[in-house]
């Protein structure tokens, strides 16, 4: 239905400010007052004044007064004539007033009726609001309003005619503005009454016109509002019906979902994909629900509220949609959790690696930890790994750290079954898992995937039964201990590949070639930064066993410089040059070569008898003395330092890890014969060393050497405390057994071992501190550095106290021979031999004290230098600490580095038992310098005064 457009009243009701007969009623009253009725004189006849157009007589007061004054009183006839004329005019005026009253009364009644009718219709129109939020009710309201508008439209012509009549009346009878003085007067003249009537008509006409315009405008607005509301309600109703149908279909699909526990593990990815497709398919429902809610909100703003039925339907749609969303999200999460926990890439299968009362749990970053429900404790290490570490303690009686480390790694290798894995198999697994990029950071799940594939491939290739969950879990545990002791859950791909390559069952040369290829560029060349990264990753293996001190410590810069001496001044090194350097078995990598020899020697039997324990045949390593004929020692006796009387192990010894040949026997015979004619002093001046020494000077790690894995700054707090405690206990045990073992025949082994194990700075024996590069140190908190500084200062105080104690003992030992010689002259001859023997013992004791004092003094200097370095790091801002530290360390290390650590030639393939003839000239110079220093120390301690001065000088330095 087209909206009814009603025309408003176009009439204006003007108000006239000029009244044409303004003084007519005034003249009449004046005339009435001027002509008294009791006395009438008709002496003179006065003609009737003419009428103007308004009907008032035109009587001039001047005329009347002049006439009366001139002639005296009027004649009765004249008075009668005047009176009659007045009566006639009064009658006419009365008739005219009655006619005006009748006309105004005819207008006032219709206007009053129109005003009342319009007010009633306005109330009826207001009663139609507010509209109900239901389609049927709004349609009914629309029909009612259409009838209402027809009624109003039909009344329009009558209202227009009445308003036109009022307009015509007001145009004929204008009125003036009502003055305040006139409005307050009680006596109103006829003229005023006429104006009041005109004014009243004008007011009624104005009110009626305004009400008519207002009603017609409201009718049009109401019609539009009803049309708009009906349109929105129809849209809401259709959308809700469509949404209800769609939600019913979705709920039907949801009802067909099987419980998670009834699904097959292999089908979990398919169900996850189906849930994702289901979620995408019903995503338009979200837009539909939003549209319905927006329409309902717009209706509420326009004061149209949905009916109870529609409100309930909309609420149910919202509830069902939210429930469907929650169900889909929970279902997807359950499927993903099940796939993560039980799928092929999950760690669920690893839960069988532990037995009751242990339970394998997973931290938020996917790192496993283990719960002992019986002891109510948790730990990072697998129970089997803890047992393995406890068995490694049995190997601590091995005197030589390279062999001790190799023996420990061999046990770890066999426990992890990595000795059965070839490097070729490992490379295939690495390629399958896209581990070509060494800088890629792996998480725990990726490591588990690689290890699982590795051990499954091992089962296929070897045809042996492997406990895959146990091997994977223990290998993961070992890799985390080595490269991620902070348990951050992240590990570089280079770290992972280095760990697997070092322990796999492959030749050393192949391992080293592969490791070099991982840091080399496309031209098979490597710069110092990448080589430092490789050596840094490799040194973490002995560091985890607490053996890093004997291999130059965690600082790999001296090893990098030693290797680049083979590059002939180029900034890069080639694979052949790297292998040439490694074949010399440098101090930082000697443990890898020894591990290979230990592996080969395990199955070897030598058909000879041990000269100490009488074991025959000798299994494993065989050590032949190159000083005495027919003296062979088994690996147990040699490595633990056992020796029989007359068999000093500091003489040249040849190691064999394969059965000897006749040519080797003849060569050893000739060497032994030659050594027979050499004095003991010769062997002391030409000490044998089984590795290429690398001068370990105190310097910070190179800024280009990255940390092996992301580590938390507080992650190794307990390990550092444990390390300090073990080092202190070891030092105390050595101090206590130092004098008790001084008379043992194998004291030279202890001394060599002590020198071997303590030849590197104290900082190198700290795995947590030495492992971090300056770039990571700059980001550490100041509090962590202060803690490390406090630890180092404590150890410095311990070393200084021990240094003072040893100096005092040295003074006592120096004074004892003088007292013995002076008393020997007065004693009987039968005591001379006893005193001489005691003097020899004291001299030996003095020599050992001097050696140990020298070591402690070196440690003290290095520790003080490191403390100074740490103080500088604490005082410097982080942006400047790296560059300044690197420059300072380079300047500090250059003088000492230039003095030694040049590669030596190798005469034998057994580095721990080289012949003294093959020692280079550089090592002889170093030995002579060392001997000169010892002589100076001997002369520096003959008296208490000189020793105090020397001690003060050393401490001050």
From Swiss-Prot:
Modified residues (Phosphothreonine): 910
Domain WW: 358-383
GO biological process entries: central nervous system development; synapse organization
Organism superkingdom: Eukaryota
Tissue: Detected in quadriceps nerve Schwann cells. Detected in sciatic nerve. Detected in trigeminal nerve Schwann cells (at protein level). Detected in brain and spinal cord.
Alphabetical UniProt keywords: Cell membrane, Cell projection, Membrane, Metal-binding, Phosphoprotein, Repeat, Synapse, Zinc, Zinc-finger
Subcellular location: Postsynaptic density; Cell projection, Dendrite; Perikaryon; Cell membrane
GO CC annotation: cytosol; dendrite; glutamatergic synapse; perikaryon; plasma membrane; postsynaptic density
Pfam families (UniProt xref): EF-hand_2, EF-hand_3, Spectrin, WW, ZZ
UniProt biased composition (Low complexity): 876-894
Region Disordered, annotated ranges: 876-923
ZZ-type zinc finger segments: 605-661
Disruption outcome: Mice with a Schwann cell-specific gene disruption show no obvious impairment of nerve conduction velocity and display no visible defects of their motor skills. After six months, about 6% of their nerve fibers present myelination defects, including myelin outfoldings, focal hypermyelination, and onion bulbs with thin myelin and supernumerary Schwann cells.
Subcellular location, principal: other
Residue stretches of each Spectrin repeat: 102-179, 231-337
Reported function: Required for normal myelination and for normal organization of the cytoplasm and the formation of Cajal bands in myelinating Schwann cells. Required for normal PRX location at appositions between the abaxonal surface of the myelin sheath and the Schwann cell plasma membrane. Possibly involved in membrane-cytoskeleton interactions of the central nervous system.
PANTHER family found in the cross-reference section: DYSTROPHIN-RELATED PROTEIN 2, E3 UBIQUITIN-PROTEIN LIGASE KCMF1
Assembly description: Interacts with PRX; this enhances phosphorylation. Identified in a dystroglycan complex that contains at least PRX, DRP2, UTRN, DMD and DAG1.
Protein name as it appears in the record: Dystrophin-related protein 2
Organism field: Mus musculus (Mouse)
Gene name per UniProt: Drp2
